[in-house]
């Protein structure tokens, strides 16, 4: 009797196994596609004017252009002179016409149209992304010592943190948004261990835990940023306890 029961159980298990093998396989849902990497819009045609030995003259032109409703900033060029760039035009002719009107009104004298291929980002295909990253860091270093002012985007009034990062990126041909929160949203998330020169790092310096501060990573655990009011743009270490506790994430745009 015992043997009969054992045989019955074995036959039942075999039948179940056959049915299981013959049943239709369940359809496996495909994995959702990866979200496409975000990318910044490239700068178009920009007007460059002025070649000043004294920074104060570049500051005055920058502020005058802002009064005309133009986004303007100035920088120290390779020849040691301060120059001003402003505008972001879709075509060279649009930039030329605007520059001509400004010259006719006496606001600027000679001008030069910066073309998209003149920017560091346009040279990435030839020299590689490393070249662009080094250019971003070099540009950021040129602003060390400038005073901080919330909402400021000129070297006269100073830079706030996101004004600095926006200007550095735009001078290299990448149209980074104005505010730290939108800069955070516009980039691709990366782990802290994946940071490379030119990436942006973000902090929550307010009590609400939201993005409120940004800096440009320059390698070896350091970054350049515009700190609190009354201080100047400087190099800081990510291991500093203040920033280590408030680090919220990093973004790359390259």
Region spans (language model):
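Acidic/polar low-complexity segments and flexible, solvent-exposed patches
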Residues: 2-149, 154-197, 208-211, 219, ...
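Flexible loop/N-cap segments at domain edges
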Residues: 215
């Amino acid at each position: 009797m015992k043997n009969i029961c054992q045989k019955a159980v074995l036959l039942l298990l075999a039948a179940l196994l056959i049915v299981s093998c013959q049943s239709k396989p369940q359809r496996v849902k495909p994995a959702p596609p990866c979200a496409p990497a975000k990318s910044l819009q490239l700068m178009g045609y920009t007007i460059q004017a002025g070649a000043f030995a004294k920074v104060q003259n570049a500051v005055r032109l920058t502020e005058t252009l802002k009064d005309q409703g133009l986004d303007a900033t100035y920088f120290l060029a390779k020849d040691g002179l301060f120059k001003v760039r402003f505008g972001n035009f879709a075509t060279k002719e649009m930039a030329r016409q605007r520059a001509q009107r400004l010259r006719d009104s006496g606001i600027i004298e000679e001008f030069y149209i910066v073309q998209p291929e003149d920017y560091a980002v346009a040279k990435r295909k030839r020299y590689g992304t490393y070249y662009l990253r080094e250019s971003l860091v070099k540009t950021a270093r040129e602003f060390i010592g400038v005073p901080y002012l919330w909402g400021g985007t000129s070297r006269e009034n100073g830079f706030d943190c996101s004004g600095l990062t926006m200007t550095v990126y735009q001078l290299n041909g990448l149209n980074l948004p104005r505010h730290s929160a939108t800069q955070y949203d516009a980039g691709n998330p990366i782990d802290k261990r994946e940071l490379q020169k030119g990436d942006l790092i973000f902090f929550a310096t307010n009590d609400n835990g939201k993005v409120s501060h940004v800096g440009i990573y320059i390698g070896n655990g350091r970054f350049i940023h515009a700190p609190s009011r009354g201080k100047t743009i400087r190099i800081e270490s990510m291991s500093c306890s203040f920033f280590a506790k408030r680090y919220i994430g990093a973004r790359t745009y390259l």
